[in-house]
């Protein structure tokens, strides 16, 4: 239903079966499901080969997915590598996506896109053709083994906050309540 009606943001469907053949005295049995569009912010980065082409590839691949649409794209910025590994500079940016995927499904999708771009996970914080991180997903707070939302390190990384403030400066961090712009301003003041 949501795919057929792009202006609809949420739908709830309930199917009832009267006089269902169950061994209990019930008038009806029903199943209810709710689906909605979610807004997620993703960080993009590349420091190998044609960096901008890899970032564009990620955006194109996300738009090819029938359950995901890229709605905003930040400017791309060149940044020094993070994490102490000697390597080339990164090109970083952020995007806003509207998605019907759950956080786990979205993670699976972006991991597949990274793999299609030739990403190899050999060195922690090492060079990569394409890196895609889920930064924010609605106002969700999630702390699982392979998925942390909001992204654990996002408040410490200017290469995330700067492009994110370009497209979502007034979006609030779900844990500390500060806007992305406030987090970036704090980082700038601390560097002075």
Q: How would you name each of these model-derived features?
A:
Residues 16-18, 80, 147:
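Glycine-rich, charged/polar anion/phosphate-binding loops
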Residues 11-13, 29-31, 40, 93, ...:
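Hydrophobic residues positioned within well-ordered beta-strands of beta-sheet architectures
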Residues 6, 24-26, 35, 86-88, ...:
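Short coil/turn motifs at beta-sheet boundaries
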């Amino acid at each position: 239903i949501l795919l057929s009606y792009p202006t609809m943001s949420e739908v709830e469907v309930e199917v009832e079966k009267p006089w269902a053949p169950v061994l209990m005295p019930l008038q009806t049995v029903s199943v209810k499901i709710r689906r909605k569009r979610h807004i997620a912010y993703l960080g993009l980065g590349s420091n190998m080969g044609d960096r901008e082409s890899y970032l564009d590839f990620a955006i194109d691949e996300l738009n090819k997915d029938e359950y995901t649409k890229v709605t905003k794209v930040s400017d791309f910025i060149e940044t020094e590598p993070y994490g102490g590994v000697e390597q080339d500079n990164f090109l970083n940016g952020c995007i806003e996506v509207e998605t019907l995927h759950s956080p786990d499904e979205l993670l699976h999708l972006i991991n597949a896109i990274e793999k299609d771009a030739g990403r190899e996970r050999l060195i922690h914080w090492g060079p990569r053709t394409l890196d895609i991180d889920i930064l924010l997903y609605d106002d969700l707070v999630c702390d699982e083994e392979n998925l942390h939302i909001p992204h654990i390190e996002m408040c410490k990384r200017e290469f995330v906050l700067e492009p994110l403030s370009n497209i979502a400066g007034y979006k609030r961090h779900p844990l500390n309540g500060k806007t992305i712009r406030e987090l970036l301003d704090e980082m700038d003041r601390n560097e002075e």
